[in-house]
């Protein structure tokens, strides 16, 4: 029988300030459900390190909120954000990079691409405990061939796209 390979990818995004806005709007139940969704993937993989792999993209705007001490304190009764980030650091997840403020690269000025990419890499290294990110998840799957030289400069080896 032929070998079978399967890649599972998951992208998580949260507009900047949205978790706090939901919490303050009376829709705190929604923020609670969202935060639990961020905690679940790594729990699902625990105990299956020998066979389970996940490619995961966390948007820069989500990472910025997860880093924010005020967000961590506000939601500490729901989930331990530092705890699940620590489990992410130790897990069998391959994180893929992105742009910090979820830019649609082909619609953004090319002069901004490097900064968006570098900012995400700095935050990703800090919060996710990885030095390198081999894959890149373009926000909104916005990709154009002109991005390739920039992505190579930042050490990326592959890009997840839905079509070319």
Regions found by a protein language model. Give the residues of each.
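Catalytic alpha-helical scaffold of carbohydrate-active enzymes acting on polysaccharides/glycoconjugates
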Residues: 1-134, 141-164
């Amino acid at each position: 029988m032929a070998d079978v390979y399967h890649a599972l990818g998951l992208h998580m995004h949260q507009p900047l300030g949205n978790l706090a806005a939901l919490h303050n709007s009376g829709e705190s139940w929604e923020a609670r459900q969202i935060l639990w969704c961020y905690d679940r993937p790594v729990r699902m993989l625990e105990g299956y390190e020998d066979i389970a792999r996940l490619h995961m993209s966390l948007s820069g705007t989500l990472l910025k909120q997860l880093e924010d001490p005020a967000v961590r304190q506000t939601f500490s009764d729901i989930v331990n954000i530092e705890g699940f980030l620590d489990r992410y650091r130790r897990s069998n997840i391959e994180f893929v990079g992105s742009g910090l403020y979820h830019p649609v690269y082909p619609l953004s000025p090319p002069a901004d691409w490097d900064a968006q990419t570098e900012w995400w890499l700095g935050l990703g290294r800090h919060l996710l405990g990885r030095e390198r990110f081999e894959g890149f998840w373009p926000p909104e799957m916005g990709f154009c061939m002109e991005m390739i030289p920039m992505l190579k400069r930042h050490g990326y080896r592959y890009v997840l796209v839905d079509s070319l």
